[in-house]
């Protein structure tokens, strides 16, 4: 396929040409499904807890608090961990809105088979776009007719080198960004490769803008390209190849996970 040196050429395509190559897809993306999730009291509480833990992580990576105060914090956190340990385990996102019970029942649920929004509730726990995951920066993504745009601000927990985002997190952001974009091709798949060019440092505590679009599709192969900018400065660009899943593969993944958790 084309090299990253062709990104400018790909970006210069008119919207009309790209619309002709990749007409509006019936595949509904994870972005749309997340927007359609019912905001239940439990989901709201999860997101609130995640936001507070995210704040703790950020504060802990940049504090100069003394040992006594840190020990007191650790004691408080241990109590919270104990409360969590006392509650039942499970994939809570499989039970939102009384959709399903767990595991294989989720996979067999007709709403899941019909690609209902709740099937995508797992993405609310994504480490990059999930508001219910404290590890998430989080990224904010927006779906358009022929591209996905978004923004993200990384805190101190993602630092390396000094003052900048660790390259591994930049790569993971691209995986999420391009993975959310591939549905514009008319199919959804799994990551085969990511080719990343780091053009300049990606700063912390700065709102970064992202953009991704479909570059090509041949049979089950989907090529997606994307960029990250700090204002007008390009910090990184990426090409990813995704292989669309065979029918029934997602359901099989759910079944396999359910079997593993029962053993």
Regions flagged by a language model, labelled:
Residues 1-16:
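N-terminal acidic, proline/glycine-rich, low-complexity intrinsically disordered segments
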Residues 5-9, 21-116, 202-204, 215-263:
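HotDog/MaoC-like acyl-thioester-processing domains
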Residues 35, 141-147, 165-188:
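Active-site helix/loop of acyl-thioester processing domains in fatty-acid/polyketide metabolism
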Residues 162-163, 167, 201:
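Alpha-helix N-cap/helix-initiation motif
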């Amino acid at each position: 396929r084309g090299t990253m040196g062709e990104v400018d050429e790909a970006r210069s395509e008119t919207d009309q040409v790209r619309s002709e190559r990749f007409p509006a897809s019936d595949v509904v993306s994870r972005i749309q499904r997340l927007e359609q999730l019912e905001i239940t009291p439990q989901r709201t509480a999860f997101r609130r807890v995640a936001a507070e833990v995210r704040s703790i992580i950020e504060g802990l990576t940049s504090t100069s608090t003394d040992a006594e105060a840190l020990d007191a914090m650790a004691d408080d956190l241990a109590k919270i961990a104990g409360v969590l340990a006392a509650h039942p385990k499970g994939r809570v996102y499989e039970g939102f809105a009384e959709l399903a019970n767990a595991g294989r029942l989720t996979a067999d649920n007709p709403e899941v088979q019909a690609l209902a929004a709740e099937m995508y509730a797992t993405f609310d726990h994504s480490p990059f776009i999930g508001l219910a995951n404290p590890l998430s920066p989080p990224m904010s993504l927006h779906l358009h007719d022929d591209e996905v745009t978004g923004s993200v601000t990384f805190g101190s927990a993602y630092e390396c080198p000094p003052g900048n985002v660790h390259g591994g997190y930049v790569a993971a952001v691209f995986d999420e960004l391009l993975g959310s974009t591939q549905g514009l091709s008319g199919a959804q798949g799994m990551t085969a490769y990511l080719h990343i060019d780091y053009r300049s440092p990606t700063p912390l505590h700065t709102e970064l803008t992202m953009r991704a679009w479909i570059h090509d599709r041949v049979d089950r192969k989907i090529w997606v390209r994307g960029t990250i900018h700090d204002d007008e400065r390009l910090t990184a660009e990426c090409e990813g190849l995704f292989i669309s899943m065979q029918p029934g593969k997602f359901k099989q993944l759910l079944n396999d996970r359910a079997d593993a958790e029962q053993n």
